[in-house]
């Protein structure tokens, strides 16, 4: 398909291409011509703005008249219709003027002021400091660095732990202490929020959980920008976006906070259960350590037949003798031997003539596990 060059044939690329008389001051002439052209362009712009304004006014007036016509009585409709016809005529007149202006502009040769136009416009801000690559730390180095951070900034961390009002209070806090926007801060808040959950301190846990999520969001933004979170420009940009966030994003944020709180509660329950099991295991080990036969006295006591258990609870030796006479000998002997091995029964000096089950000298007594 051949290219049509006709629209470029009359372009006024430069005024200095015109021939002028030798006695005429060429630079001054060019300046005058250019000034006159700019004035004509300004007049056309004002005319276009006037047309746009009048068109808007007539359109608005037309809408109002149409509403009146729909709600008017039969007697008023003819008057309103006349007004509508007048407005339509005005509207048509402005359309014709606009068409004439467009045609005039189309036929006018291009010049140095109209040959180009702004395709797009951008704004630039100071470049955010890029995050410098760092050598990865070993687990030991990272743990030491985190411990040092906790000790150095203990007072600031404790202040951050009680911040209310969500992101607004975080923004004010970081404005004074931008260096606290750190992964270690998020770690400290997580640890302390978990401790609060273990202690059933819901309010404290929720406060720190929200602060932790805010810091993590800030860290994610800085990572996406390949910048450091301690950069004040990054922080301002983050909180500006946070404040202007749409409801759907705020709901996502709130859901994230609640989910984190639930994870903390679940983890706290697991920690409590584990601590209880550990304490019970230590107590059991201590009891077994003091038992003559290395058997847990509490476990032995809980496994005793009910009638024997009652005798030990009441420290009633006579009743225990009665149980020994009624119970199957092998069964009684099995449990009685376990009582001796666990320390529930402390044997004394028995009479040689009495049976083992019936021996109950002054030195021997049944004991119960607490």
UniProtKB/Swiss-Prot annotation:
Its main location: cytoplasm. One of its GO terms (molecular function) is protein kinase binding. It holds the Pfam family CDC37_N. Phosphorylated. Dephosphorylated by pph-5. Coiled coil: none annotated. InterPro entries: Cdc37, Cdc37_C, Cdc37_Hsp90-bd, Cdc37_Hsp90-bd_sf, Cdc37_N_dom. Keywords: Chaperone, Cytoplasm, Phosphoprotein. Residues 1-12 have a biased composition (Basic and acidic residues). GO terms for cellular component: cytoplasm; HSP90-CDC37 chaperone complex; protein folding chaperone complex; protein serine/threonine phosphatase complex. Residues 1-27, 41-63, 272-296, 345-370 are annotated as: Disordered. It is found in: Cytoplasm. Residues 351-370 have a biased composition (Acidic residues). The keyword Chaperone applies. GO terms for biological process: protein folding; protein stabilization. Forms a complex with daf-21/Hsp90. Interacts with a number of kinases. Co-chaperone that binds to numerous kinases and promotes their interaction with the Hsp90 complex, resulting in stabilization and promotion of their activity. Inhibits daf-21/Hsp90 ATPase activity. Belongs to the CDC37 family. This is Probable Hsp90 co-chaperone cdc37. It comes from Caenorhabditis elegans.
């Amino acid at each position: 398909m051949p290219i049509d060059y006709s629209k470029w044939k009359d372009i006024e690329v430069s005024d200095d291409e015109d021939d002028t008389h030798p006695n005429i001051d060429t630079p001054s002439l060019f300046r005058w011509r250019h000034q006159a052209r700019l004035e004509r362009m300004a007049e056309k712009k004002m005319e276009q703005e006037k047309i746009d304004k009048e068109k808007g006014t007539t359109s608005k007036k037309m809408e109002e008249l149409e509403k009146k016509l729909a709600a008017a009585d039969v007697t008023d409709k003819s008057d309103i219709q006349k007004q509508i016809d007048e407005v339509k005529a005005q509207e048509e007149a402005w359309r014709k003027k606009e068409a004439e202006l467009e045609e005039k502009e189309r036929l006018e040769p291009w010049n140095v002021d109209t040959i180009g136009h702004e395709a797009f416009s951008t704004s630039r801000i100071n470049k955010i400091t890029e995050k410098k690559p760092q050598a990865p730390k070993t687990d030991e180095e990272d743990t030491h660095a985190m411990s040092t951070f906790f000790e150095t900034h203990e007072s600031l961390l404790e202040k951050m732990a009680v911040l209310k009002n969500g992101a607004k209070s975080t923004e004010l806090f970081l404005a004074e202490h931008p260096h606290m926007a750190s992964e270690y801060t998020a770690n400290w808040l997580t640890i302390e929020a978990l401790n609060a959950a273990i202690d059933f301190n819901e309010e404290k846990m929720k406060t720190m959980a929200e602060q932790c999520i805010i810091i993590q969001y800030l860290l994610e933004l800085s990572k996406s920008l390949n910048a450091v979170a301690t950069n004040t420009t990054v922080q301002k940009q983050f909180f500006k976006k946070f404040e202007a966030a749409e409801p759907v994003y705020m709901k996502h944020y709130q859901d994230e906070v609640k989910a984190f709180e639930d994870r903390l509660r679940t983890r706290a329950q697991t920690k409590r259960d584990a601590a209880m099991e550990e304490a019970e295991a230590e107590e059991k080990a201590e009891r077994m350590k003091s038992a003559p036969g290395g058997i847990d006295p509490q476990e032995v006591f809980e496994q005793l037949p009910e009638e024997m258990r009652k005798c030990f609870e009441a420290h009633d030796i006579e009743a225990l003798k009665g149980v020994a006479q009624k119970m199957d000998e092998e069964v009684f002997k099995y449990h009685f031997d376990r009582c001796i091995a666990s320390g529930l029964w402390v044997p004394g000096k028995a009479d040689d003539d009495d049976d083992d089950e019936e021996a109950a000298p002054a030195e021997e007594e049944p004991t119960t596990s607490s």
